[in-house]
Amino acid sequence: MSSGGNSSNVNRNSGSSNVITLNDSDEETEDSNLGSSSSTNLCKVCGAEKAALHYGALSCVGCKGFFRRALLKADQLECAANGECTVSVLQKTQCRSCRFNKCLREGMNPAYVRPNRDAPPKPRKPTTTVATCDQTDRGRTTKSREEWMKKMTVEMRTILMTLLNIETKVMKGDTQQEASKLYPLKGIDKLSDIIETPIQLKGKRTEMRYEAYRMAGNDELCAIAYRRLIAAIDWVESLSPLLGHLTPQDKIALVKSSFAPLMVFNFCARTAEACQDENVLCLCNFAYVPRNISKMYEDTYHLGNGLVERALNELVAVYREYGMREEEIVCVNAMICLNPLAKDVSDSLFEKIVELRNRIADCLFSIVKEVRLSPTPNVCYGHILLSLATVTELANAMSENLQFAQTFSNQGEIPLLTDLFGCFTVEPFFKEVDELAAMSLEKAKAEKKKEMSTQTDRLPPPRALLKRQATIDEDSEEPARQNFRLLQPPNNFYITEMLDDLRNNHAENHLISLNFDASNVSNAIASRPSFEDLGTVPSGSTVTRRIGSNIQGPSHLPQCGSTVTQRPTVPSSTTSSTFYNFPPPPGYPPLNAGYTPNVNYPNLYQQPQYFQNFQQNNYPSQVMEQQNYGNVESTSYPFPRNDGFVYNHPNIPYSHHNNSLQQNNFHNQYAN
């Protein structure tokens, strides 16, 4: 180091071994630089040193933090001295309003402030939190709607608020009447009438609320389906402004495709939201239906075929565990209504429906992401969308139930639902039955006639039931209703009963084909044929007659134990039909030409015990009075009457019962 007179040694760092030697000129230069830097690095707001560029102005760290905090409550800052306060290093905390205004005057820009940049980082969630959306606490959250809606974009908030307003409008009613008494609406038979003139529904909407307050009545199921159809129409009408101009045909197409899925989804989602009972399904009229609806209701209408049980197991249980929120329900309702694949939707509307549906799907995903506690919100979002496949399947089953109910339900036909499903028209079947019967009668007359004498083993046909009388009064119906009538029974009958009627008509036509000739059948009771006529059979047959051993007869008659085989002749006045006119057993109806029995009389008369009453009735008593068979002609024995028959009399033994050959001959005699 040099040791000149104008030089001096300056130790700038006493604790350091580094020694810097400056001469007088260098020291003066350094002092001038320090003075200039101290004057230029002062805060322009309060005058503090060590200022830097913050938010577009030279300011200290204190004024920087103050400006960022003051932006959050800028509207709450007020000055008591009319904005004339002095802002300095010592007095900068006296008035917040004047300090904030000076920050703005010095050029600090609020647009440069990024909120929550300096906030402490959020604690990382533990690794043991919910990983999927399948556990019970996946849908529980303590966030309010205002908290998570702030994190959504303006467009999503607008869509969500629009859907919530639509749901409130649809659920709210404008009448105090009961649904079962108001629906179905009279004078409204087509969807086009409502779509073209929506004013017809004013004052005809009942309030919809899903609560397990009481069990629904059987007659209320029809009104519930009708009310849900009006709700589907309201949803489509409310969404149409978001799609632009829609033609009536496009609206009808969207209503037809969304009616059943919308009803199934709301039944299940609202039940999971309002009730915790696993065996009830809430409806929209403050009522519910039980799981075993088929046992509790006579007519299940659109909820039959196990639909309630499937809905409770496959949808309600899933939604209840998941915890569906009101915001999620309205988004799904809108997605169900906006079906781009609906039948008869125009091509120009297809792209609009797809675009709006995608926007609603993004809104639904944002809701799931902000509300759910699950770290995988995409899994929860996927569960909601996958449930729509089950909703569609149950909706198809409900549509089939409604179509069947329109034809065969006791609650009658609803023209509006008929127009919804497009049922086919069929003329009443009771007119066709008469035409078929007439054709069968003509066909039977043309066939070859059959003789009864050849039908020795005839079995009685089944007894035909009486036809049910139709009660449809065509004159009282309107001409428009006569042109469009569903297939329905004349009265409240089941389909099995109607099929029985058709089968009985076929049986009656078969009887007509037999061509019974009642004019050739004589009355055996009035004619009283003789005993010889009783034993007479058609020519060609052999009769073996057995006489009881306890009866004394003439010498020309065989004694007990002997048999006589003879071939008697048939009188010319006796026809073959005479042999079918013997009296029936007691308790059986008489056999005549105008009656079709359900008892096989020829087989019945083959029983030998039928004739064990000879000694107890008038016929054997008249024979016993003669005491001599030689004095009585063989043709004077009366025909046995049909009163006082005694079966299986124990006091009269007959030896011919032990002889199988004689017994068969005895059977042939009376069976023919």
Swiss-Prot record:
Give every NR LBD domain span: 155-424
Its main localization is nucleus
Q: What are the Low complexity biased-composition ranges?
A: 1-19, 562-577
Region Disordered: start and end of each range? 1-38, 550-577
Zinc fingers classed as NR C4-type: ranges: 43-63, 79-98
State the CDD domains in the record: NR_DBD_HNF4A
What keywords are annotated for this sequence in UniProt?
DNA-binding, Metal-binding, Nucleus, Receptor, Transcription, Transcription regulation, Zinc, Zinc-finger
Q: Which SUPFAM superfamilies match?
A: Glucocorticoid receptor-like (DNA-binding domain) (SSF57716), Nuclear receptor ligand-binding domain (SSF48508)
Residues of the DNA-binding region: 40-115
Q: Return the similarity comment.
A: Belongs to the nuclear hormone receptor family.
From the Swiss-Prot or TrEMBL record, give the protein name: Nuclear hormone receptor family member nhr-5
The organism is: Caenorhabditis elegans
